[in-house]
Amino acid sequence: MAVLDVSYGERAKVHASPVARRLFELMEKKQSNLCASIDVSSTDELLKLVEKLGPVICLVKTHIDTIDDFSYDGTILPLVELSKKYNFMIFEDRKFADIGNTVKNQYKNGIFKIAQWADITNAHGVTGEGIVKGLKEAALETTLEPRGLLMLAELSSKGSLAYGEYTNKTVEIAKSDKDFVIGFIAQHDMGGREEGFDWIIMTPGVGLDDKGDKLGQQYRTVDQVIDSGSDIIIVGRGLFGKGRDPVLQGERYRKAGWDAYLKRIGQL
């Protein structure tokens, strides 16, 4: 049986990564494969949206460096408390892209101290395997909590250079650490099962209403994304942009994502 036909719960039982196991388990429990991408500029906006969306998401994706009034105690600690209250995980969309020693410092140090609080982060493969090693070292030196890394294999923006040979090389880098690299930001299934990998695929550019924006973002429907092999849909402006009600839209996208998943595994 292909992994695309297997439930999240079954995948959780045998996955090598404790981060992936926990994520699959809470997805099954909450019946949600929705990641809320909350790109805002204030702590108040961030926490208010997370409070509204927390009950229906499995993951919140942040760009923490866009928060004008950021402070660790004022921004991160309340966010972590909300993640415990509503049982979701935190993904800092940092997109690391430097040599190993540099990303190690960026991940563990500075004002953001990402390794201390983000369950998951991500990186480009452009600098090679050293980026994985550097980030893993930072995680191990910072916390006893398990951490996971996503590699950026494909992007949803028009004109992206992340395709073809670049994507293939990124997959090879991901194979260098089965425990720490848990999957990809990608537009479709990335394979690997014949070699014992069960990668989580998270896909941005998902919209039920909009087709794109003036800056090159291109949207696909929930069904298209899940049918292509994605495990988690990443939705941002579709949840709260253009005056939308995040509570209503959150449930709408949660149900759409979960129904598409149930169809894929033959349970709907």
Curated annotation (Swiss-Prot):
Keyword 4Fe-4S assigned: no
A UniProt-annotated Pfam family: OMPdecase
Record's keyword terms, sorted: Decarboxylase, Lyase, Pyrimidine biosynthesis
Record-annotated active site: K95
Catalytically driven reaction(s): orotidine 5'-phosphate + H(+) = UMP + CO2
Transmembrane segments: none
UniProt cross-references to PROSITE patterns, sorted A to Z: OMPDECASE
GO terms, biological process: 'de novo' pyrimidine nucleobase biosynthetic process; 'de novo' UMP biosynthetic process
Highest taxon of the lineage: Eukaryota
Keyword Cytoplasm belongs to the record: no
GO function terms (MF aspect): orotate phosphoribosyltransferase activity; orotidine-5'-phosphate decarboxylase activity
Enzyme class: lyase
Pathway involvement of the protein, from the record: Pyrimidine metabolism; UMP biosynthesis via de novo pathway; UMP from orotate: step 2/2
InterPro entries reported for this sequence: Aldolase_TIM, OMPdecase, OMPdecase_AS, OMPdeCOase_dom, RibuloseP-bd_barrel
The protein's Enzyme Commission number: 4.1.1.23
Family note: Belongs to the OMP decarboxylase family.
NCBIfam families referenced in this protein's UniProt entry, alphabetically: pyrF
The protein's name: Orotidine 5'-phosphate decarboxylase
Organism: Pachysolen tannophilus
